[in-house]
Amino acid sequence: QPEFRIGFLGDEAAQDVLTRNSCLKPYIEAAYGVPAKLFTFEDYAGNMQAMLGGNLDYTWYGSSGYAGMELEKPGFVVPVLTRMQPTGDMGYYSVMIARKDSGIKTLADTKGKRLGFADPNSTSGYLIPSIELPATPEVNGSLENYFSSTEFSGGHSGVVLAVLNGDIDVGFNWVS
């Protein structure tokens, strides 16, 4: 039996993601006349591979995820929607976060600190910062020479938790 399969990035608790998005099911089922199924994935790569493997019909990605799939299988995915904020702005922004009590207020304050990224396929949590940070006068070309360490923290929620727990000093996430 045909079904409409929707994938979600699962860097939050999978059940929370499914519960929060279950309201989509009746709309999809009414619009397409087939059952809708919701899936979460541990990371961007799993979601991307499910889409490229024909196991999803719809999912959300940032530009980095879309570009990665386009490079791997040109023309297979088609962008159909973009996010619009209540202000009318389109998209979202990459931001560096730190604990309020860290004393970190500027990029210069992050020298020698531990840096966390969200996911290798995240536009806001890795791609943009990995290009833009080295271009700043402070970092001057090398993340490795500026920060004491860099790591992936397991997604956007993982970055927040790692900063809160003190596992990293600063990390990249998104805001809209």
Regions found by a protein language model. Give the residues of each.
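Pocket-lining segment of extracytoplasmic ligand-binding domains
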Residues: R114-S176
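Short helices/loops that flank or line small-molecule/ion binding pockets
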Residues: A45-T59, E72-P74, A108, G155-F172, ...
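A bilobed periplasmic-binding-protein/Venus flytrap-type ligand-binding module shared by bacterial periplasmic
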Residues: L9-G10, Y93-I104
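Short, polar/charged alpha-helical segment
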Residues: E3-F4, A13-P35, I131
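Extracytoplasmic/secreted proteins, especially bacterial periplasmic and envelope-associated proteins
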Residues: T19, C23, Y27, G46, ...
